[in-house]
Amino acid sequence: MVKITSGNKKKYGTIDVFNLSEWGRPIARITAQFLEKKPISVIQVTNIHFLLSLFCAWLILEGYLLESCFLLVIKGVIDAVDGELARIRERPSHVGRYWDTVADTIGLIAVMCAFGVVLDWEIALTSIIILATLLQYSLFNHFSILMRTLGSGDSTSRIDERIRPIAQPWESQTTVNIFHTIYVLFYSWQDSLVSKLSGKGSEKLRFELTVSSSLGYGMQSIIIFLLALTQNLIYLPHLVLGVNGFLVALVLLRSRVG
């Protein structure tokens, strides 16, 4: 067992998990180690993957579907760098956690709207796909946070974010308050809904985390890239609403039967 120190602190603490969406974390960890002493902040890394998402949405609208889907995979790796960098530097950030969620959501909406335009989706279908994807991400995040709690890993994220957190010494409480308010207004309903639908879960939550991790961005971006590579992006709604919907039901059922 690897000793958890400032240099090698793991996301899930002492628990070894099989997370399908975190295939890129070793790359992210190496990148974070390279950036540890560099004059770049965690927020700046988040800004990079946020801008990359918007760039991918523009590429989709311009017809560069394969290129944009490939960059969306790269975006997922960069998305993991900010968290790894915060862990290595031992400077967790509430602002960073909230901004990362907001940035991911804006990027998701931009990309899915771009797909909707190119693939000629109805506005209602685009809206449903965005909503379903957000809930699927929330389900994965729910069990990811529970697993971190079990393993005494990263404790920055919480199942219930309605209670305003105390700013870290290196953060501004005013800024934390602003981002916390934004998070509660737009995202707390997702957390509450997932918490109500899911049960206590199995003893070690490995089944729930592994299956729900296939709904996470890392795995979904790979699948979408494969759809683009095989020129089958027309089946994207079937993926989000069909296959992923079945996996959501499977995870929720397993979490209730224990």
Which residues fall in each region the model found?
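C-terminal membrane-associated helical module and adjoining short loops/tails
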Residues: 1-26, 146-258
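Membrane-spanning helices that line or support transport/gating and their immediate boundary helices
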Residues: 30, 80, 84, 138-150
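Select subsegments of transmembrane alpha-helices in polytopic membrane proteins
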Residues: 42-46, 99-104, 209-218
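Membrane-embedded alpha-helical segments that form the functional core of polytopic membrane enzymes
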Residues: 42-95, 111-112, 128-131
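Structural signal for membrane-spanning alpha-helices in multi-pass inner-membrane proteins
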Residues: 53-61, 111-115, 141, 228, ...
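Transmembrane helix interruption/hinge and helix-loop junction motifs
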Residues: 60-67, 117-124, 229-238
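Alpha-helical transmembrane segments
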Residues: 116-147
